[in-house]
Amino acid sequence: MEEFQGHRELDRSWQHNFLYPLIFQEYIYTXAYDNGLNKLILLENGVDQKYSLLTVKRLITRLYQQNHLILSANDSNQNEIFGHKHKKNLYLQMITEGFAVIVEIPFSLLLISSLDGKEKKIVKSPNLQSIHSIFPFLEDKFLYLNYVLDILIPYPAHLEILVQTLRYWLKDASSLHLLRFFFYECRNWTSRITSKESISFLKTRNRRLFLFLYNFYVCEYESFFVILRNQSSYLRSTSFGALLERIHFYGKFKYLVKVKACAVILCFFKEPFPHYVRYQGKALLASKGTSLLMHKWKYYFISFWQCYFSVWSQPRRIYINQLSNYSLDFMGFLSSVRFNSSVIRSQMLENSFLLENIRNKFDPIVPISPLVGSLAKSKFCNVLGHPIGKSVWTDLSDSDIIDRFGRICRNLSHYYSGSSRKKNLYRIKYILRLSCARTLSRKHKSTVRAFLKRLGSEFLEEFFTEEEKVLSLILPRDSSTSGGLYKGRVWYLDIICIHNLVNDQ
């Protein structure tokens, strides 16, 4: 970022938010294809190999020439450019990746400028980056709420909506026209290309740009909550800012555009306890209000998406549920608020009586059916959950096979460490252990029983997590449990993404 700020001071066009000239700066492509910033790499001989920045320099030279973006239909028939195949795809891929870095720069600088002098006020904690930090919040807040909106955020029906949303932040019309050009070409790729190799190229090579645009779209949608937070006297909670995207919240807090119709909206939604969380395209809005108020929220969201983003959202994408009678399918957990009763015996003088104490308890559990479906899709078991061997791994060494299965078990145990009932997790681990044994027995042309007898208990040790072993030493445990491992709930604040098997839909 310091390098970008230095160029910003030297380049007058940048000072006026003109991003188009940055397309011709070589350091942009150096940043775009640096593995430290972007795991996607460019291509060299074909579609699947690396190459040096020499190709980028040749691309820059080509861009300075006339008609560098006028790619006719005849270009698709040419086989080579700079010794590479797929001329058109390679051109647009490199420019798109560089453009993705360019459009991120103004927002990054805006965030940095908004944080100047505020470091002491903003609590900086790496734990806030963990997606598991959401669950302690749910555990603390949702116990006292009545209803929840289960929201599936709609995707824009047309990519032009993303461009129109972005134009309020960028003054450079040339960059917006270039963005439209990328979208048009990507649409043509989708309609023309049918080979498996090219489809894979499409899905991965433009990921950074499309993720940025989608996150920007969601950020614009969530700015409504910032308006409510700033305008309403009922929404003064200091923790409210932590519920939004932390990357964008403080930047939008200062530069938010005031809406004249906000007073009408506030009259419509005056209530003191709305709580909002989101992960990817799914959001939850919980409230202590009545069912009528939640219906107002529901139809407001539908009207808001339709009027502001021109997105038609069907009412069935938003469900109104009562927390006491509903399980939330969120971030790979089935979470519910259930009553937990306990009986206390009290004695006063010679009289004794029983008191029943009822309290709410947040109960996240492991969903067995989706996980078994993911395992079946990955060929670890069949659709009924019966383990099968992973035949594609039989060419690996025994240690590699055991390490792969053990790593999957440890990752799942790590992610579901906060589950209140781990019976389903143990079933998943059993499927993986037996699938590993079947894979090894198939490789050595032996039976599963004979193979397990030969390996003994050391084979099972590979599937225990280090956390289970350590927690068993420092925390109390039930002596009746097998192996003496700790069975309590623990939320780990170092998890930044969902495991592929958990998020496989």
UniProtKB/Swiss-Prot annotation:
GO biological process per UniProt: mRNA processing; RNA splicing; tRNA processing
Tagged with keyword ATP-binding: no
GO molecular function term, any single one: RNA binding
One Pfam assignment: MatK_N
Any one cellular-component term (Gene Ontology): chloroplast
Keyword line: Chloroplast, mRNA processing, Plastid, RNA-binding, tRNA processing
InterPro entries the UniProt entry points to: Domain_X, Maturase_MatK, Maturase_MatK_N
Keyword flag Plastid: yes
Superkingdom of origin organism: Eukaryota
Compartment list: Plastid, Chloroplast
The family this protein is said to belong to: Belongs to the intron maturase 2 family. MatK subfamily.
Functional description taken from the UniProt entry: Usually encoded in the trnK tRNA gene intron. Probably assists in splicing its own and other chloroplast group II introns.
PANTHER family: MATURASE K
Protein name (Swiss-Prot/TrEMBL): Maturase K
Record organism: Gomphrena pulchella
